[in-house]
Every structure is written in structure tokens, then in C-alpha cells.
Amino acid sequence: MVLVVGLGNPGKTYESTRHNIGFRVIDALLERRSALNATKSTFKGELHKEGENLFLKPTTYMNLSGESALPVSTFYKPEKILVIHDDLDLPFGAIRLKRGGGNGGHNGLKSLDKLLGNDYYRLRIGIGKPPLGWEVADYVLARFSQEEEQELEERLFPHAKEAIESFLEGKMEWDRLVSRYSLKPSTPKEKV
């Protein structure tokens, strides 16, 4: 069994923000897998079960994500946990798979690390650094530009879904999975 946790903040206010990319990937994945209806909401989150796999969107705020993931993990005892989250240290358009490591100041990861330890798998989705003069909190709670939304829909979400599907199948060695599904940012289109 694999527990896939998408990080984000609950509510319409945060729906399309940079910090909610984990929720959005879970939604895109479940839509494709026909499992969009939540089966349980007793773990401070929306929990979807499909076959042997669990998909969790904590309904706590980002900095309390571990309070949702811990009881799910304790009850179901998954063999692996994959966390999907935004990453300021990667440029927009980049995707990296990683196991363990530091939290990079990400409050959702801090909460998970505190309650679960940090030996879980991660799908890091780059959102880039805030522009000069922006506070980090304002940047991660801002919406993507129209061009970025288009790239999310056409390039990043399909790639992330494919990476997660391969991870869930468990047929590919970790190093090969990391190599195959790491994604560099797209190059800017030349202006004519």
C-alpha cells in the first residue's frame, strides 16, 4: 500500500495558489483514475482509496499537514509515503523526485517531519523564487499567471501524473524513476 499526500490549504481562497499544487496534482490524478469522491473525512483530510493505494488531501492548514497524515499512516500502515508539494528551490516548470532530506523551510514538510520523520518520498514541483520585493508567504499564496496555468495543465500535471503512476506500479527501481521523471523547466518561447 502507498499513501500519496498532496499538500495544500483548504478552501476556495487557496484553490489555485502556488502552495496548493499538491492538492491540484491529487485532483488531476484522481480525475484520471475515476476516484474523485472522498471515501473518508475522519483523518482531518479528504481520503480517497483506490485498490491498495490511498490519496490524502489534508484539510488542516499547510503547517499542520502532519496532523492528518499521521493518523492515516498509523491506521493503514502504508509501505511507502509519497508527498507532492511546491518547491521554491526549483524553477517553475521543474519536477524532481527525492527521498528524505531537509524541508527547505516548507511548513507542510516541517509538520510531516515532526510527526512522521523525513524518510518518505517526495515529488517536488518547482514554483521558483519570489520576485524581488515579494515576501515568501505572499508569493506562495499568489495565483499562477495565465501562461503558467497553461504550462501546468499541458505539461506539468500530465508529467506528474505519469511519475506517480509509475511510482504506484512499483516496477521501476528508484534511481531509474528519478532519472526518468525529473523534468527541467521549459525554455522560453522565442519572440518573433
Swiss-Prot record:
GO terms for molecular function: peptidyl-tRNA hydrolase activity; tRNA binding. It is found in: Cytoplasm. It catalyses: an N-acyl-L-alpha-aminoacyl-tRNA + H2O = an N-acyl-L-amino acid + a tRNA + H(+). Keywords: Cytoplasm, Hydrolase, RNA-binding, tRNA-binding. The active site is at residue 19. The keyword tRNA-binding applies. One of its GO terms (biological process) is rescue of stalled ribosome. Its EC number is 3.1.1.29. The record marks 9 as: Discriminates between blocked and unblocked aminoacyl-tRNA. Hydrolyzes ribosome-free peptidyl-tRNAs (with 1 or more amino acids incorporated), which drop off the ribosome during protein synthesis, or as a result of ribosome stalling. The record marks 86 as: Stabilizes the basic form of H active site to accept a proton. Monomer. This is Peptidyl-tRNA hydrolase. The keyword Zinc does not apply. Belongs to the PTH family. Pfam families: Pept_tRNA_hydro. PROSITE patterns: PEPT_TRNA_HYDROL_1, PEPT_TRNA_HYDROL_2. Its main location: cytoplasm. InterPro entries: Pept_tRNA_hydro (IPR001328), Pept_tRNA_hydro_CS (IPR018171), Pept_tRNA_hydro_sf (IPR036416). CDD domains: PTH (cd00462). TRNA binds at residues 14, 61, 63, 107. It is an enzyme of class 3 (hydrolase). SUPFAM superfamilies: Peptidyl-tRNA hydrolase-like. GO terms for cellular component: cytoplasm.
